[in-house]
Amino acid sequence: MTQINHKNKVMDKLKSIFLCGIFLLYSLQTSLASVVSTGNFNNDFFVTWSPSHVNTSADGRSRSLKLDQEAGSAFASNDMFLFGQIDMPIKLVPGHSAGTVLAFYLTSDQPNRDEIDFELLGNVSGQPYILQTNVYADGFDNREERIYLWFDPTKDFHTYSILWNLHQIVFMVDFVPIRTYRNHADKGVAYPRWQPMGIRISLWDGSSWATRGGKDKVDWSKGPFIVSFANYTIDACVWKGNARFCRADSSSNWWNKEEFTSLSWKQRRWFKWVRKYHLIYDYCQDNKRFNNNLPKECYLSKY
């Protein structure tokens, strides 16, 4: 009997050690899957278009893109992510920037791609900048919204942020929510929730559509056109091939916590202010475009 009891105690101890090991391994994998980067462009990004038009400071903390008659320019993240928040301070092209487009977005680069877009559309001198946002889910887009910015984005850096989790996507400017796109997959609305996405940033000639529907083209005599970036933060789950780590409600995956499932009351007040005073186009109000058959999400809660 004594030998049996001793054997049981040993087995219980081994079982406890095994379970602790599994827990520690899971915690370690979850922790390793999440990354906080406070901004070295050389470490986190690679140039995808026109290296001669991309200028990075010696310490890697700031970067600029150039557009001229020769080419635009672009860079992309080394990693792919599934949920998190990206904050990118940007200083836009000053003066006459009509026809230029600065795109900051997440994309899965798949045929049925998911994508979350910021597009900053250049202006004629004296006119306000327009910020366009869009969401692709399972290859479908046509979800554009446009606002006028309430400040001059060429005078200083302003932070453009994307919060993305299982519950919602929140577009923010200087941490003011300007748009949400909620997960209504249970109601038949496509939502980006399975495909990891990388960060892409590009500056290019959008003369055919960007400013007043293409009426105002890029004036190359005003160039070159320069956009600057600095002090970004990536706080997101790096894709390692297993979605459950990125979906876990862990201390490192703070964006999955209950408080981020919808806008706070304070955020809702700011959101309503933006929609009331600065919104200039919302696809959910464009009955003509959709032949009076608006997408399902247009009838569902935004927060």
What positions do the PLM features span?
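GH16 jelly-roll
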Residues: 2-3, 12-303
